Amino acid sequence: LLFSFRIKSEGNAAHISAKNLIGSETEKIRTVNRVAGYLADHYQESSSLDELASRFFTNKFYLTRIFKQVTGFTIREYLHIQRVQKAQEFLRSSLLPITEIALMVGFENVSYFEKIFRRYCMQSPREYRVSQKAESH
């Protein structure tokens, strides 16, 4: 199991595994896991593809290809997922304004944050917060 993420709700977890990849792919999987771990830890930063490739001693085109091959996501999609997950945590556990949460998780533009959040959660951040409050009562 490479990593997992929750998008719609805590009960619906999607898992990404490497079981379909052959043994000679081990180094690709390790590289992708290291990059995914870095992105998960540094989700609020905006690293360029060139910076990521340099950090992990690889070519940006190769990194892009293997990341998508192993995870099924582009690097940008994976970073968005990490940011949305963190935003979900803040929306559930705090009363911080949505604008502040967007900035805290790495989105510079609140409208873009709301668009990405809606893409992965099928509801706006405000709707998500209200639904989580209703479920906990």
Language-model segments: residues:
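An amphipathic alpha-helical interaction segment
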Residues: 1-23, 27-31, 62
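Hydrophobic recognition helices of helix-based DNA-binding modules
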Residues: 2-9, 39, 67, 91
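Basic/polar phosphate-binding segments, predominantly the helix-turn-helix DNA-binding elements
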Residues: 21, 38-84, 96, 102-127
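Short, leucine-enriched amphipathic alpha-helices that occur as contiguous helical runs
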Residues: 28-36, 80-88
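Short Asp/Glu-rich motifs
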Residues: 87, 121, 137
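Generic C-terminal helix-cap and adjacent flexible tail
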Residues: 130-137
